[in-house]
């Protein structure tokens, strides 16, 4: 993953849930910069906690390389936050070199005192990210049948849970 160049276009940052402005969502988040050499000898990273408004950052491959495949990426972080760069954006850029889109999910982490929903927040966010990618497949030049999910550590648990708790949403609705 070292020495990867950015894709042709800047990544698109979207709120996972409608009615939220992606540019104002980070006001309550805590970002810890992790120096180069701590997790990876060549790359710095960031650990984001207190995520209240999840986002998905869409890294599309160069048009000439695009295969139509996409992967929703769930960074790890022990459900205390997300290692957004090393286990998120760096992986998305690597997927771009293979012709696949990388969609980095910055998901909410459980706060039992606040979460009264039937499904845990991270799972809701992952299911929504997959539905959104499928709903916007034509716009992003993706094949909706070639959208997968992967994760690292807690994000791996989240990815496997999302894969076994499939949620089609409302495919005929304007908002998936």
Ranges and model annotations:
Residues 55, 59-65, 83-89, 96, ...:
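Non-catalytic cap/lid and distal C-terminal segments of serine-dependent acyl enzymes
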């Amino acid at each position: 993953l070292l020495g990867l160049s950015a894709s042709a276009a800047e990544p698109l940052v979207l709120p996972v849930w409608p009615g939220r402005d992606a540019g104002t969502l980070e006001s309550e988040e805590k970002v810890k910069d992790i120096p180069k050499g701590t997790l990876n000898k060549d790359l710095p990273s960031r650990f984001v906690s207190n995520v209240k408004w999840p986002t998905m950052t869409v890294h599309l491959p160069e048009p000439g390389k695009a295969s139509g495949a996409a992967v929703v990426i769930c960074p790890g972080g022990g459900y205390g936050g997300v290692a957004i760069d090393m286990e998120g954006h760096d992986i998305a850029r690597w997927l771009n070199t293979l012709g696949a889109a990388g969609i980095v999910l910055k998901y909410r982490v459980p706060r039992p005192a606040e979460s009264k929903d039937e499904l845990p927040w991270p799972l809701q966010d992952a299911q929504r990210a997959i539905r959104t990618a499928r709903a916007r497949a034509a716009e992003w030049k993706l094949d909706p049948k070639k959208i997968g999910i992967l994760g690292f550590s807690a994000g791996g648990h989240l990815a496997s849970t999302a894969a076994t708790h499939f949620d089609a949403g409302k495919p005929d609705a304007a908002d998936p």
